[in-house]
């Protein structure tokens, strides 16, 4: 009888341990990029936080290709600015602009104007994604995406001031 009890106890122990294994792997929540209109608001606010005044957007010409680039927000008193690159923009511009940076890489800059002295930071929409409470858990919030965008704008403004860009 003792042997039977030990065997049954071991069986119960192993069965319960197997039941406590990791749960099913779940797919990541679907995400979407920050809307361009909202991104421009965030960019304008970030410029203000750096003590500068946001200026109206404008069209510029990329050096070497002659393709037009839309600067979504300029900085008053300076020629540099910020372009929020949507998937559609990236498709239209193709090889005229550098490929999207990964989150751990430096921001991409484009040279514009006749001599290429003017710098425009390219902020790719796909780098600012959120999950909008879809799925089981909220992993990437809108607030987080907006903070990352704001940080990138502020980093560029600091870089532009340090380098004394036009």
Predicted stretch roles:
Residues 1-9:
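Bacterial N-terminal signal peptides that target proteins for export
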Residues 16-19:
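C-terminal motif of bacterial Sec signal peptides marking the signal peptidase cleavage site
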Residues 21-59:
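Acidic-basic catalytic patches of nuclease active cores, encompassing PD-(D/E)XK
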Residues 27-31, 49, 76, 133-166:
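Non-catalytic C-terminal interaction segments of nucleic acid-processing enzymes
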Residues 54-70:
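N-terminal post-signal-peptidase region of extra-cytosolic proteins
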Residues 65-67, 86-144:
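Catalytic cores of nucleic-acid endonucleases
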Residues 69-84:
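Active-site beta-strand-loop-beta-strand hairpin of nuclease catalytic cores
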């Amino acid at each position: 009888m003792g042997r039977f009890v030990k065997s049954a106890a071991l069986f119960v122990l192993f069965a319960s341990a197997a039941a406590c294994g990791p749960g099913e792997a779940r797919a990541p929540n679907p995400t979407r990029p920050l809307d361009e209109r909202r991104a421009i608001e965030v960019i304008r606010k970030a410029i203000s936080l750096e003590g500068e005044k946001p200026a109206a957007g404008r069209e510029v010409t990329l050096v070497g290709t002659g393709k037009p680039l839309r600067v979504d927000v300029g900085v008053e008193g300076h020629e540099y600015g910020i372009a929020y690159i949507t998937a559609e923009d990236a498709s239209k511009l193709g090889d005229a602009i550098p490929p999207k940076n990964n989150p751990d890489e430096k921001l991409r800059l484009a040279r514009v104007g006749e001599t290429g002295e003017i710098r425009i930071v390219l902020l790719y929409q796909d780098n600012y994604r959120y999950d909008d409470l879809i799925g089981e858990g909220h992993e990437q919030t809108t607030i987080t995406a907006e903070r990352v965008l704001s940080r990138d704008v502020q980093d560029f403004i600091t870089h532009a001031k340090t380098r004394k860009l036009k």
